[in-house]
Amino acid sequence: MELNRRDFMKANAAAAAALAAGITLPVKNVYANDNSIKWDKAPCRFCGTGCSVLVGTQNGRMVASQGDPDAEVNRGLNCIKGYFLPKIIYGKDRLTSPMLRMKDGKYDKNGEFTPVSWDQAFTIMAEKFKKAIKEQGPNGVGMFTSGQSTIFEGVAKSKLFKAGLRSNNIDPNARHCMASAAVAFMRTFGMDEPMGCYDDIEKADAFVLWGSNMAEMHPILWSRISDRRLSKQDAKVAVLSTFEHRSFELADLPIVFKPQGDLAIMNYIANYLIQNNAIDQDFIQKHTKFKRGETDIGYGLRDNHPLEQAAKNAKTAGKMHDSSFEEFKQLVSEYTLDKAHELSGVPKDQLESLAKMYADPNLNIVSFWTMGFNQHVRGVWANHLIYNIHLLTGKISKPGCGPFSLTGQPSACGTAREVGTFIHRLPADLVVTNPEHVKTAEKLWKLPNGVIQTKVGLHAVAQDRALKDGKLNAYWVMCNNNMQCGPNINQERMPGWRDERNFIVVSDPYPTVSALSADLILPTAMWVEKEGAYGNAERRTQFWFQQVKAPGEAKSDLWQLVEFSKYFTTDEMWPAEVLAANPEYKGKTLFDVLYRNGQVDKFQVPADKAGYINDEADHFGFYLQKGLFEEYAEFGRGHGHDLASFETYHKARGLRWPVVDGKETLWRYREGYDPYVQAGEGVSFYGNKDKRAVILAVPYEPPAEAPDAEYDLWLSTGRVLEHWHSGSMTRRVPELHRSFPNNLVWMHPTDAQKRGLRHGDKVKVISRRGEMISHLDTRGRNKVPEGLIYTTFFDAGQLANKLTLDATDPISKETDFKKCAVKVVKA
């Protein structure tokens, strides 16, 4: 076999990734040149980077994968998880039939899981949903969904709940990872999602990572940063975190700060910029406006919690007051070098070096962040503060310069945010609380006025509380494992799931912790077992075709949503006055009015594509995915969210919106790059009516919980390279499981010695909410400072979220998984 340069580079990259994880990589995943294998493209199933892979199928099975050499994102490379993608769908315990808890031939909350037909499953499910709506109103039902759902599934579920069932109680697990970023985008720019793109990496002179371990969580992007750092003279990398991780290995400026200290650091930088005349006055005057945020806003805990009782402005947490540059200058002036050092624990010379990087007018700089910023009781503020720095310097919306929020899931942007599967959102940045936005949605969905409620539903943590309190009685969990991944399992989630008043449905391909805690399990098709679309962190929309069939009776989430709609009629779900005013809708099923409405069902599948598979089209009789997409795309066309045609995406390796006249947009808000910026404007933040971005003055405030005499350590949670989220897919890949089989607790050697502990010891981690048994690591990849431990949540045998606190950012309602107090003893 002849090996060309591209193959050589791919093989070496694959081998390097495997070596980092301690894995032997199958040769077929590197070269995959078997001519009997059929290849087609698909975006990776894992993180928000949006790598494209080539999927190899043979005899109806996925047998190989390789990085897509024609993809701009990853350029033929995959991370170690990507190289083992074929194995995620072939776990020995795949679910192949609906499973209902039964006893003596009928449903019983305490019964054993028993196989049932889809009709039996949907019949009992519809009965429970109708009962909950009759007793509680539309708010008695809810859905917790996902940033891993396809765009088509997102549209279908949003329509089913918000229009069909008239419940805005639908929220994605992106609430736990991207809500703070999304809210801050909207508050600052009037539009969601980053203004830049991955091309910034090759054009930047410096990179600053805030609470982001890109080396393990976004490894392909990290490989591009590494290449830039090593190939460009004087390129710099700064990494900020509460502990040292693998990204520190490349850092020129490695900074470890005290939990919550990032707020003080960023306010110090803003102060430094002003005091040293390193701000762009012209840019500020033309393109920004100043606001002051509400303070003392609480921590998103239950209303009767002492911290909420003491907070002065918990009810108005999101309020912003008109302000001025002088008032902003006065607030940040308090954040001197001494104060920033005191609050953050960072050496003064490091703080000054970081500030000078942002102050250098000749330095193109990109700020990246992920969960360290977002999973934060002041996550919205943290996002605002980094925008402040880029807006003050004018280092934004141009090649190699800008703030860049990275996503953790493959379609947290494309589905959760762009489609709008949050409790308050509709497609293309529309919101349910705006009556005009609601009218637009009803018109585009061909629905009568008055169907969609204008009140925000229950967010993720509030759903847990409502289930526990008996106010939410029918609940559908789709494409996530929230029993394992959500906070405060013991006190706030498990009680509601096992409450006799409630009926819990979980759609999943595997018997996860969530599935086994449910009353009804629906077996789900995975990834290329269905046709789909994702939207990644750089606004890139990517499509793929179905390539294999799901096993047994497993069905896609899209099929489940649309088929379930047949079990309800408008007479049962919609107000009598709406039907009286619109008699043509009376007596129809929700399937008729939502999906067979004359526009979703008007397309047929391509007749000229050999070997084409589409299980949904075969079942429903029309090209469901195309119909849903074209209906959805109308929301954004002409409004700065333009998408290309359906067929275009199947041909391309993704396009970055807005796509106008067939051309994608790399940098938004900048003349010459963004078609919505008019000639002569230079920069236009057109999401806001006045076309100005907000610079927000907010202070440092402490976390919800901190170590004390009894619980004397900080706990931070996160992930490792080898596993993704709850491990329900990656732990079923033998090679990945062997490389990192179980969760660990990383502790500083001095802290271990003080407690009479040693590396490898079995330990018990205890918080005010629960406890977890694990093993101690004082030598591994993560180097934690004294006073803090780090652990992960991929291990179903060690439920780390029994420890975490359900405190949230009061504005975004996103959970802080990075800061709570624990103690550690020998087990």
Curated annotation (Swiss-Prot):
Source organism superkingdom: Bacteria
Descriptive protein name: Periplasmic nitrate reductase
A Pfam family per the record: Molybdopterin
Source organism of this protein record: Glaesserella parasuis serovar 5 (strain SH0165) (Haemophilus parasuis)
Designated gene of the protein: napA
Cofactor: [4Fe-4S] cluster; Mo-bis(molybdopterin guanine dinucleotide)
Ranges where the 4Fe-4S Mo/W bis-MGD-type domain occurs: 37-93
Keywords assigned by UniProt, alphabetized: 4Fe-4S, Electron transport, Iron, Iron-sulfur, Metal-binding, Molybdenum, Nitrate assimilation, Oxidoreductase, Periplasm, Signal, Transport
Subcellular location: Periplasm
Gene3D superfamilies cross-referenced by the UniProt entry: 2.40.40.20, 3.30.200.210, 3.40.50.740, Dimethylsulfoxide Reductase, domain 2 (3.40.228.10)
Residues the entry annotates as binding substrate: F793
PTM per Swiss-Prot/TrEMBL: Predicted to be exported by the Tat system. The position of the signal peptide cleavage has not been experimentally proven.
